[in-house]
């Protein structure tokens, strides 16, 4: 898969736009509440050879030879915006739709087809033929790009109500279908205060602002959220690869959310029983899904600069489950407990702590590795101002070794101006 198809695309507008997007859900019938549908939320950079995740989506859509999957790529640029249109390096709504359709067929789907909604054809989201197409399918996959494009193409009017197509997808989800997405396609599943963009260091300094912004540094959010399919907490993608732990903490603090789910690249959070009586969450894929718990967090202000203490951090890896009502991590069977070895701390403080799995590395190489690592941390690369992160073992700290990544729970995060 071309690298540029894995990257998030920003779309410029002239001014910040304050928006509100209702989830517009219709109460499900009693029969729907008994089971519900499924979500598969991928943190971006979804490798085309990640058999575990693709086959899971096909399974949830009815299984090999039965699954019929609709591909939605409205977050991508349209062909006229793509300088590589018509080449193997294309990255646009049409070629991405064809690409994913072929990929899902290669993983056993009986059929996979593009749903023709994009910025060139927003009216298609109210076309009865498109609604009939959606009603014939058993699963859906939303591609990456800019999640705000999903808002502009699939919601309607000043009140941002569901288009006919989105309402049909919502009904299918309640009725048992799977809805999956990667990067922006996962982000759009979120409920209120969905993030629209923003860099970590400016976001920490200036705080979160409602709306969609041309400046990619502004930490923006939509107060009424995305499609509202996933409401157990805020969602962020490309999480530890892009060091988004801190920006998510600031957004959650400013919008008074107690929990954030951070999805790493090439990794998925599977949610089954959506809208049903029992909802289950588990992790699949290469890296991890972070859960940030702000229930006991407190905002500080050193020298008038925002800071926070007491954020609890857990990270689940492949096979782990999460009990959302209990805020509890359940490590997968067979994972061995990691016991810190006796001795002084050898973990090196990070000089770029909000980037490229730096904070995960501090836990794995510090808190989980040596008893002498009472606290680990580092500073931000940016220096206007420079930020410091401090990680300590909280009550109930534990780490477990997985095949490709380490599960941990009970890490406490503090962030302040350096």
Please annotate each region the language model reported:
Residues 71, 81-83, 100, 111-116, ...:
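Divalent cation-coordinating acidic motifs and surrounding scaffolds
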Residues 147-162:
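Glycine/threonine-rich flexible loop motifs
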Residues 31-65, 71-94, 195, 200-418:
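C-terminal and late-domain segments of enzyme folds
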Residues 141-144, 168-169, 173-193:
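Catalytic nucleophile loop
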Residues 134-135, 173:
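A short, aliphatic-rich alpha-helical micro-motif
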